[in-house]
Structures are given as structure tokens and as C-alpha cells.
Amino acid sequence: PPSQVVAQNSSYVTVDGEFDSLEDRSFLTMDDYELSGKNVILRIDINSSINPENGDLLDDTRIKRHSATVKELSDKNARVIVLAHQSRPGKLDFVNLEKHGKRMSEIIEREIKFVDDIYGEKAIQEIKNIKDGQIILLDNVRFDKEEINLKTFENDNFKAQSNAKMVKTLAPHASYFVNDAFAASHRCQPSLVGFSDYMPALAGRVMQRELDFLGKAISSGPTPRIAVLGGSKAADSVSIAENFLEKGVEQILTGGVVANIFLIASGIDIGKPSTEFIEKQIPDHEKVIELAKKLLSKYDGKIEIPSDVALNKDGKRYGTNVENLPEKYPLFDIGVDTLVRYIQIIENAGTVIANGPMGVFEDSEFATGTNEIFSAISKSKGMTVVGGGETAMAFNQMGLADRIKHISTGGGACISFMSGETMPALEAMR
């Protein structure tokens, strides 16, 4: 049974900084059981950029992040059996995990034994020989065909995944499963969900931090809680807006293609170029616009849309009020008046969640909206949470990442969580 040695509202320090554990949570953590002397299967996400010419690691960010969890389990005298993936079949960076293990070993300054096997005789023998505090890293789980093929969450259960050969072979040799792979938690693969049928499934520190920050930001962070939603993945962002508003987020600030969707939904003709982009690039765009209309009606005054925009007029920035639309030029950024209004809202917010840029920020002519809004978020005195993927990359490129309370490790996983979707790996931990 879980021990009650550690209170649920303990504070923790990770590679990404301090965080407080949720007082009310639906998952167990590494504190809830005595792990000393126990075999622990730890699933992490160290999928990294690889030089295709020599196989060298180009980025060790994820390895550093998960190293802290590996080290903590080793410090607890657990016998750590690490599972992870790298890329997928057919890709140039679909390689084994030997160099990942070597880099992690350097980071935590202790031996990590790489085993070029996943659940064959060699892997099982190494697991049988493991001692307290030792760490072994098994090979790329995606070398196993079932890890790739068994990916469907059927009939609200994980029977197919829990019956996978990898899971059935490794499970008898472990007492606990720790899932630290938040970035892959929207996937339903054996190594992520299968073990929970055989042993307690616990959240690792990276997973715990993600769930704590994202959960608080959406549902219980300091008020007023606002969300800045932009970028080109408009269908995702409109779904996120719906979930946020249902959870009590007070205001949504829109930019990018997301703003264009809401402008159309509010009855504004945004012009042929921007309309055609939505029709070609946004799947089921008519349904997305209908949902946006519904949200504007249901949550009157809570969704902020641009009052002015910047058009791309032959490569030059041209500002105009939305009343002057349609124009024959595409919308590439929010306008100055909108920018000032959004910044005032951000400055007074208790919690700010950001996902997606305000415009085509890759072009310096149209980067003003994104640069200024992201800068304002970085200066906020409230709780600041940034989605993964291109948003996290933009904050890093702008040198603002260190000023943000939490930047998510997951792109697709973060979007799924913020949209309120069922996430298989999280369901398996309940």
C-alpha cells in the first residue's frame, strides 16, 4: 500500500526549477511507495536530435531533464530499468540508445549500463543481475514492432498493450512502473500504458511537474487566468479555448490564424488570401468556424479578437483596422492597438498560459506582435505557463525562457492536455 511518509503538498526541485505538488491529485508519485531494493521500470522520453552522418547527439535537453528522475530513483536505492524511444522506423535518426545512455551517465556522474536488447534473454539476464541503486538502459522500444503497431485505445482499456510481448516479459521482473514521459503521454503504446495492469503506475518528476503546472494554470491558478492562443494550428486552439473557458479561464487573447478564425466567426470578411489559407490548411475548417461562433456567443466578452491587423503588402507591413477589411493582402500580424490592449490584460493577469505566436514571426517585418506579447508574458509577476513545440522554441530563441515559470516538454501532448482530451498514459496512472 502507499506510504503516507511524504505529504502531498511537498515542494520539489527539478532541472526546470522548483514546484509544489498538487494537494489534490488523481495519480501516485515516487513518494507514495518505498522503492528501495525494488525493481522499477522507468519510461522516459529522451527522443533527441541526431546527426545523421555520425549518429552524435545534437541536443541533450530532454536527456538532462529526465536525468534528474533517474538519479533520484538511484539515490533511493531502487534498481532502475529504463525504457525509452528514439524516432520511428524509416527515419535517419532511428538509432539505438547507446549514446543517450553515455550522455546521461556523464550528467548524473554514475554508471548507466546500456543493453542492446529490449526483452530478450540478454535484457532479462541483466535485469536479474541488477543491484540496489544500479541503472540499466534497455534499447529503443520502437525497435519492437508491437510498440509501433499497438497504438489504439480500444474499448476504454489497454488490454492489447498489456498483452504485448515486451510488457508480459518485463512485468514479472519489476515491482513498480514510473512514467516520466509526459511528451509521449498522448500516445497509447505498450511501453507507456501496458505495465499498469501488472503493478502500481507512478508519475516521475517530469510528469508530475507538467501535470501540476498545467493543471493549476487551467483550473486553479491565481486569477484572473488568461490564455494567449495563436499560431496556425487553429483547430487545436479553438478546442483549447473551449476547454479553458469551461474550466473557468477568464479571458482568451487570440492571434495568428486562430484570430482569423474568430474574426470570420464574428462576421468579418478577412479577405481572399487569408480565407483561402484557412480553407486549404485547416481540416474541417467550417466546423472549426462554427465552434468559434458558438464560443463567441456563449462566452460573450471573454474572447478578445484583434481590432486592427498588419497586412503583408508586397513584403512590407501595412496596418489597418478590421473595419477596413477585406483587403487583397494577407493578414500577417496583430496591429498596434490590439497589441497595447493585449499587453494591458497580460500585465494584470494572475495566470498566463501561452500557446502559439501572434503572427508570422519568422519574418522580422511581422514579428512585432509575437515579440512584444511574449516579452510582456516573460515580465508577468503571475504564474506563466508556455506550451511546447514552436511556442517553446520561440521563447528560447528570444532568450525569454528563463523568465517563464514553466515551459512544457510536450508539443502534441501539451495540446491534448489543454484541449481536455483523454490521454492514454495519464488514464493508465489513475
What are these regions (language model features)?
Residues 1-430:
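Active-site loop-to-helix "anion-binding N-cap" substructures in soluble metabolic enzymes
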